[in-house]
Design a protein with these regions (language model features):
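Outer-membrane beta-barrel biogenesis signature
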Residues: 13-42
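Internal, hydrophobic beta-strand segments that form the core of beta-sheet-rich folds
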Residues: 170-172
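Gram-negative and organellar
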Residues: 20-29, 128, 150, 154, ...
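Gram-negative (and chloroplast) outer-membrane scaffold detector with strong preference
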Residues: 42-47, 62-139, 147-150, 158-160, ...
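Solvent-exposed loop/turn segments connecting transmembrane beta-strands
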Residues: 52-62, 93-95, 176-184
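Short coil/turn motifs at beta-sheet boundaries
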Residues: 34-36, 59, 100-102, 117, ...
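Short glycine/proline-enriched turn or capping motifs at secondary-structure junctions
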Residues: 164-165, 178-189, 193
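Bacterial N-terminal signal peptides
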Residues: 2-12
């Protein structure tokens, strides 16, 4: 062992010499042209609240949703959106403290402005909203459990260096036609995968 150490000490390698022939290359920014386009899916979660008469009797709730869409060109897409949320009635009525779920299904158009890894978008569409029970009828706010909904929103999307994944934050505002003069607002964060 001592002989091996002595040999490596006295017969060690010569000092290394390196030659620099050019400056190091700059950081390579991602090329948005290489980001995947076409069919995509999104999973989202966040909060949903009611405005108008329904907002006085129904508290804000947790929302979970999904989107499936198709980018026809880099700046325009069509998508189907499903979201469900759970709420609790509030106030001093006989139905206070009861749980209520709302389900919304919409078909939306989406316009996007891409700036390297960031993109800003606006979206809007039409669809249906359905309540899980007749609590709103008991409160005198709605006649039917199912009705039309229309609205829109927008947000920001951050694309990773991977060509398939991005994350984002979006907000939306929808009119509920069967809930007297009421609307719902939603803020969600999402993960997107483009095939």
């Amino acid at each position: 062992m001592a002989a091996a150490l002595a040999t490596s000490f006295f017969c060690g390698a010569a000092p290394a010499r390196a030659q620099v022939t050019s400056e190091p290359s700059a950081v390579v920014f991602p090329d948005p042209a290489k980001f995947a386009t076409g069919l995509y899916t999104e999973g989202e979660f966040g909060g949903l609240w009611f405005n108008g008469p329904a907002g006085n009797d129904i508290g804000a709730g947790f929302a979970v949703g999904a989107r499936v869409g198709y980018d026809f060109v880099r700046f325009f897409a069509l998508q189907a959106h499903l979201v469900g949320s759970t709420h609790q009635t509030q106030g001093d009525s006989a139905v206070a403290g009861q749980l209520l779920q709302m389900y919304q299904a919409t078909v939306e158009a989406k316009a996007t402005l891409r700036l390297v890894q960031l993109s800003f978008f606006a979206e809007g569409g039409l669809g249906f909203a359905r309540m899980s029970s007749n609590l709103l009828y008991a409160l005198g706010i709605a006649r039917y459990r199912t009705g039309l909904t229309a609205g829109g929103g927008g947000g920001v999307d951050y694309h990773f260096l991977s060509r398939h994944f991005s994350v984002g934050l979006r907000g939306g505002y929808y009119v509920l036609t069967e809930v007297h003069n009421s609307r719902d607002g939603m803020v969600t964060t999402y993960l997107r995968y483009t095939f």
